[in-house]
């Protein structure tokens, strides 16, 4: 509940909510179904607001969540919220579809809705390297243990490859809406 006399237009003060740190919950909880529920809730906490409302919490690190006993989430620190235009959100969704279906025309359309002006074939190829990495967990409709996911080293190597390829083609100026 908000505490009005301690809040301003720029500061929201609320009553205390109960919950434990994410890692504490994971270490304490033996029930695999409850852990899977937490994973699904964290997934939904990110994707549902973005895909349905065009809003993201711009600081989604583990310190900004506490977990209730039922694996429900308490989301903390709303200091970095970003609202996106519907065409940008539809571009994100269509880029996922383009990567999944290997549809280059749809990828071009998606990048244009993101704000990239006249993306070249080579630029699309390079950006799709990164997009494929980002969308990889969503491209297969199955439960995927974290141990099966690429390591942080793989992410770094992918980012380095994209950076190198972008330099080769003269760089790219990310559209304003693309940068948080």
Regions found by a protein language model. Name each.
Residues 14, 47, 108:
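Short glycine-/small-residue-rich flexible loop motifs, especially phosphate/cofactor-binding loops
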Residues 1-9:
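Short beta-strand micro-motifs within the conserved protein kinase catalytic domain, predominantly
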Residues 7-8, 17-19, 24-41, 68-180:
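Helix-rich C-lobe and terminal helical cap/extension of kinase-like folds
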Residues 13, 61, 77:
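Residue-level signature of catalytic and energy-coupling elements of molecular machines
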Residues 63-67:
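Hydrophobic residue at the +6 position relative to the catalytic HRD Asp in the kinase catalytic loop
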Residues 37-53:
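Conserved helicase/translocase P-loop NTPase motor core
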């Amino acid at each position: 509940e908000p505490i009005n006399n301690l809040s301003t237009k720029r500061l929201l003060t609320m009553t205390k909510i109960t919950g434990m740190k994410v890692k504490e919950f994971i270490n304490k909880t033996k029930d695999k179904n409850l852990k899977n529920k937490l994973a699904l809730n964290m997934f939904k906490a990110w994707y549902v607001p973005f895909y349905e409302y065009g809003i993201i919490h711009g600081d989604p690190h583990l310190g900004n969540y506490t977990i209730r006993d039922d694996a429900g989430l308490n989301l903390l620190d709303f200091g970095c919220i970003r609202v996106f235009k519907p065409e940008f959100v539809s571009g994100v969704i269509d880029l996922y579809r383009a990567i999944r279906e290997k549809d280059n025309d749809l990828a071009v359309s998606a990048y244009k809705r993101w704000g990239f002006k006249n993306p070249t074939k080579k630029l699309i190829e390079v950006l799709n390297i990164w997009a494929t990495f980002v969308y990889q967990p969503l491209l297969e409709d199955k439960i995927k243990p974290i141990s099966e996911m690429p390591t942080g080293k793989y992410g770094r190597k992918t980012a380095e490859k994209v950076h190198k390829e972008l330099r080769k083609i003269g760089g790219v100026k990310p559209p304003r809406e693309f940068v948080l």
